[in-house]
Amino acid sequence: MTTQRHYSPIDRLLLQADAAMRTLLPFSGQPYRPSPAIVQPDVQMSDEDIRHVAGLMRINHTGEVCAQALYQGQALTAKLPQVREAMEHAAEEEIDHLVWCEQRIHQLGSHTSVLNPLFYGMSFGIGAVAGLISDKVSLGFVAATEHQVCKHLNEHLEQLPAEDEKSRAILEQMRIDEEHHAESALEAGGFRFPAPVKFGMSLLAKVMTKSTYRI
């Protein structure tokens, strides 16, 4: 029989600080799975295509920074232990996406967004508030967020140059994982958000995508 470890409030704050550092510091996280891009060939692309792909991958990287913060904020305030554990497990899986995107960005000779700390803080706060309201709302927010991420991934897959199989392999695996996270959150009892709430979330997402494409 397994025993569940109980953390003090100070312990949890230290864990959150550690998670933030691992998310925001370059190459500080290690993926649990190797990047899908490894087995894909290196190809020559025009400077314009390289800049565009780097911008898309920067958006996706910041999206994963937000996902990390969202899950950590929810884990901090989740009421049921099993929900807290689910959030922490999902955050671990998202580390793969975070590192894959960062690796690809650097391969393209570019940089991650300087706005990541700002978006991390905002997302952490949103996640913590959602967790305080109820676990049902918290899980529903995960599902709605992941569906929004899948929408962006589909759009980015359409914009990638045909020859860029490395970025494509990463985004396709990310889409599979995000769809699974969304369905798992709903199956666990997540609230299905109404259309107006989803619309508001999409507007916030546009702010993130427009700003991080270049910086």
Curated annotation (Swiss-Prot):
Coiled coil: none annotated. Its main location: membrane. It catalyses: a 5-methoxy-2-methyl-3-(all-trans-polyprenyl)benzene-1,4-diol + AH2 + O2 = a 3-demethylubiquinol + A + H2O. Keywords: Cell membrane, Iron, Membrane, Metal-binding, Monooxygenase, Oxidoreductase, Ubiquinone biosynthesis. GO terms for biological process: ubiquinone biosynthetic process. It holds the Pfam family COQ7. This is 3-demethoxyubiquinol 3-hydroxylase. The lineage of its organism: Bacteria, Pseudomonadati, Pseudomonadota, Gammaproteobacteria, Pseudomonadales. The gene is coq7.
